[in-house]
Structure formats: structure tokens, C-alpha cells
Amino acid sequence: MYRVNHLVYRYQTKPVFSPCNLEIARGEYLVLMGDNGSGKSTFLNLLAGFLKPSEGTIYFMEQSLTAWKKDPIHKKKYYAHLGILFQETDTQLFNATVYDELAFGPRQLQLSEHETAKRINDCLNLLKITHLSNQVPYQLSGGEKKKVAFASLLVMNPDVYLLDEPFAGLTKE
């Protein structure tokens, strides 16, 4: 899935991490652990294509991330493979209900309304938040917003999950 060759990222002249080489195959898990400021979030932002490496190349499905992002159609396909959840979760749509928030991605993929509804209901049940489906963002607590953000990731059924502290702020339920 991913191959990273001699990846370096610098803030101005300061390297965030040493040159990195790794491969992540389909079905594998990679967990990044380290102190605050050690570059974990930066690394995820690089894999997501939100940051450009100072040096090195990132490959996804044997094609460089640069090539994926050059063409708008390829870029859309790349992001269709990704599920991204960063620590800050206040990304809900303006006045959309939770249900409409969760339906946004599947509708962009042009899934049928039946399939969209099934995916949404499965995610709401899994996360035990069915009671939130008609709520709007300002009515939700921080933990509820986090669960909705996680549901919006799961409903897309991506090939790759990029998670940055996905369970921070959640209760153990």
C-alpha cells in the first residue's frame, strides 16, 4: 500500500525526524508512538498528502503521491482510499444533522441511498450513538463530536485509516 523512501520533513531548517524508510502492506497496522513534538502528526500529514516532504518520496499503490495529486481525478481517487481522523474533530458541516454529516461522503461516492442508509445505521449502532442522528453539531458534547467524526470515517469503509489520537477525550464505553 505505502512505501516511504528517505522521507525527511523540516520546519524551516530543523528536521522533524530522521530520514525514514518503511513499507506498509495491505492489512498491516503501523502505530506511531513518541513524545509530544516527535513528528507523529507530521508523518500522518505527509502520508495524507497535506504536507510536501522536504526530501524523499511517498508511494501509494506503487505510484508516487506527487503523481496521485497532480491530476484532480487521481487526487479524488487517492482520497477515496483514505480515512483520516486527526485529534481535532470539530469538522462537522455547518447546520447538517449527524445523519446528513455521515451521508455526505457516501453520496460523494454516488452510493445508493439504501447502501448509504445501511452504512450509516451500522456505524451509529456500532458506536452506540443512534440517538444523535437528528442532532446538529452545536448540540453535541466534545465526546459525541469525536464519535460522529469516527463514524464519518467508518461509514466510508476506506482502505487506509490515518488516525491521530482517535480515542483522546472519549469515555471507555
Where are the regions that the model predicts?
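Conserved ABC ATPase "signature" region
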Residues: H114-L132
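Conserved ABC ATPase signature
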Residues: V136-L140, E144
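Catalytic Walker B motif of ABC-type/P-loop ATPase nucleotide-binding domains
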Residues: Y161-E165
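Hydrophobic anchor residue at the start of the ABC signature
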Residues: F150
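The feature captures the beta-strand-to-loop junction immediately N-terminal to the Walker
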Residues: M33-D35
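Conserved ABC transporter NBD signature motif
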Residues: G56-A67, Y78
